[in-house]
Amino acid sequence: MTQNPSSDRRPDTAQSVANGETLDGALFTGLTDTAAAQDESSETSASFATIDGEDKSEVGDALDWFSDGKETDINGDEADRGIQADTQAKTLVSLENLTEEPEIDGAEFMAEAFIAENTAVEDVSPNPNPAIDTDALAALTQSAVELTPPPPINLPKVELPPMQPLAPLMAIADPDNLSPMSTSIQAPTQSGGLSLRNKAVLIALLIGLIPAGVIGGLNLSSVDRLPVPQTEQQVKDSTTKQIRDQILIGLLVTAVGAAFVAYWMVGENTKAQTALALKAKHSHRNLDQPLAVAGDELAIADQTIDALSAQVEKLRHQQDLSLKQAELLTELSRANLSDIDEIQGVIQKNLDQARALFGCERLVFYYHPRYQPEAMVVQALDLTTQGLIDSKDPHPWGQEDMPSQIVAINDTSGASISNPHRQWLEQHQVKASLTVPLHRDNYPLGLLMAHHCQRPHQWEMRERQFLQQLTEELQTTLDRANLIQERNESAQQAQILKELTLKISAAINSEQVFDIAAQEIRLALKADRVIVYRFDATWAGTVIVESVAEGYPKALGATIADPCFADSYVEKYRSGRIQATRDIYNAGLTPCHIGQLKPFEVKANLVAPINYKGNLLGLLIAHQCSGPRDWHQNEIDLFGQLTVQVGLALERSDLLAQQKIAEVEQRQMREKMQKRALELLMEVDPVSRGDLTIRAHVTEDEIGTIADSYNATIESLRRIVTQVQTAASQFTETTDTNEVAVRQLAQQANRQALDVAEALERLQAMNKSIQAVAENAAQAESAVQRATQTVDQGEDAMNRTVDGIVAIRETVAATAKQVKRLGESSQKISKVVNLIGSFADQTNLLALNAAIEAAHAGEEGRGFAVVADEVRSLARQSAEATAEIAQLVATIQAETNEVVNAMEAGTEQVVVGTKLVEETRRSLNQITAVSAQISGLVEAITSAAIEQSQTSESVTQTMALVAQIADKNSSEASGVSATFKELLAVAQSLQEAVKQFKVQ
């Protein structure tokens, strides 16, 4: 039996739906239209199966719910009953899995379905036990056991609430009472009355029995009314004929009635199945169109299909809703927050979208960070809800009583809540409420509340999760906005620090520094008061500068003494401590400290030290009087940096004041010195006219030091002038006396220079002669060296000649030996040739004998005779060749002997040549020795000539120097003579110059 290839995945896919997995519309595209094909099949019939005592409708391949995504078309002409029964059984098994009813054995169920299929038409007959095809039943059982589960569906898993059974207890809830996220369903009601099978059996029995009973009664009555004929055979024949005719008529009527009933029932069944198939085929497009069917199993199946379609629609709607929610959260996480002012608009937009997806009438977001004066309240309402929540009373809890977990109220009328809470809910017409808290460091920051104002609502886990995710995403968005705000504030604070530093730098004294700092810091921090608190020697302090907002008490001039400050806080503040107090009443301060701050309405403060040249000068304090304040770290850092700038500005102002005082003192000192300098110039003015007897008045200031130094200088100058006058007189006298002697000395120097020049010329001539001798000696030495080299080369050539002759002698001796060996070898060849000749003679003799023997043999030995002749011819040729070889050997021996003799004669000549070469080499050695002696002598002569030339040159140079010295002396003598003349004129001029100085 052929099995539908798309039916092996139905039970597990249906079980996936029962387990709550999300299915999209693609899973329903595999619904087949086989029921439409059944409408054309002549074998289509209504069949029923009984499962555990309950009648289940057989809907055929039209309920092929969960295939692998491909539509399967089955031609009704080709589909057999086994395929139809198999498909129907799997469909019912899928329905049973979907409704989560107790499991039914697949083989037993298919067997019953097969029985019902095979007995659908025969049920009209009286036979209650039709035959069962056991082979087909076994095949069906095997096909049911071998069903394989489908592969897993790669879809996102969404946690769903437990599903209600689809049939027979499944119900569709009123859509008006459901939120877009609700998945509750209502089972269809089961129709009363008999099943289709019982109806068909009852009608078939009635149609079959009533006509038969009527006809039988008529026959019986007719038989009873028949007259008794005379002849029994005629009566019997007549009665038999009538009964037979009546039976035939009854059977014909029964057959016609049964055929009519069967045709009508099959038509109705096929009509319902066709409608169900069309609905199942188009269920993924027309899930919301109900189908009206009669109130039996088909009607129940129709209601089941409607319920399942509604649930699938709910699942699809839920999946779309989850996708939109995810898109909303993603859009919120990617919101562009270029400015902190945009945050409320972004939250408002996303709350409107979230409320539409959530299906509630009101969605309220309340956010109030710690120590912030105002809270953020954002509301999203539908068009039917009237009245916004007051931003001053946005929720029914106090700030400290806000819930720490999700609070879900399905019905406010019956919820166990406090009276204020109930009153608040009734005031705002809240019927159901879901609240998600927002915390940071265990401190409640806000709430996200969803309200149903029309009717109570059962909050599902999915709704709680979405609202919690939305709350977390809103918190993330607010954190991003806070980071942007902190970044902008940091940039603003940097600009404030820059501007304030420039303003403080422009202050010329400490009062201006403190005034500017207090005013600008209060505006920068948006504080209510900023004061400068300065210490005295006992570490008690006074408020010397104050900048305070309107409406708060003034602290300027207040004196505050803290007896514990010197022991506990001086070193801490000196090292740069900055103390930030969010709330003075919850900071652990002593009652004394709180009492000092309370008159000024201080709720929070920020304290930083003012250090001046390493000493603690005072404190810069910022007060928040409107309420507690959570000082941010960037504000604390800015406050500390500004305090440092105040200290630097104080140092700068002190330096400026000191600089001004120094400038005044320097100006007064300069004016005084200028006056004394003028007096000094007037006192020493006679010195410029040559009066060295004047003395300046000495005082105790710097000018007095200059006057004293000036007096000492004038005194030294007076002594020098006196000495110059004396020296000039003496010099004049000396110059007059030595002028004649210097003139004579110049003349003698000139004569000496001429004599030296003449001697120098003679020395130069002798030097040239010595250089010529040295050059000739050098040339002779070069010639001797070349001769020595030539002799050495000749000696080397003689040595090589001797070596060559010796080698020739050895070669000739070796050649002679080889030639002798060649002669001996030729003698051996001669012996061999003689031996070969004897062999040839013997061969010739043997050949002759063989020829004779062949002749004796006659015809038989003729061939052997020819061979013998050939052998004898060869022997003769061998003898001739042997004779020629012997002659050649003899010739070789003779020539060898001649060569040996020539070699011996050459050897003797080589020996004689060797002796001659040895004698020549000894002569060359003697020549070499003589050349070496000559070379030594020439070298000595050359050295002596060179030495004489050098000595002569040195003497020449010395004489040249002497000549130069003589010339120089002559010129210097002339110069000295001229100088003496000039000195005489200078001495006379000096005497005239020093006469104008008054030294006594």
Curated annotation (Swiss-Prot):
InterPro entries: Chemotax_Me-accpt_rcpt, GAF, GAF-like_dom_sf, HAMP_dom, MCPsignal_dom, Phyto_chromo_attachment. Coiled coil: none annotated. It comes from the Bacteria. It holds the Pfam family MCPsignal. Residues 342-478, 509-650 form the GAF domain. Residues 671-722 form the HAMP domain. GO terms for molecular function: transmembrane signaling receptor activity. Keywords: Repeat, Transducer. GO terms for biological process: chemotaxis; signal transduction. Residues 1-59 are annotated as: Disordered. Residues 727-963 form the Methyl-accepting transducer domain. One of its GO terms (cellular component) is membrane. Belongs to the methyl-accepting chemotaxis (MCP) protein family. This is Putative methyl-accepting chemotaxis protein sll0041. The lineage of its organism: Bacteria, Bacillati, Cyanobacteriota, Cyanophyceae, Synechococcales.
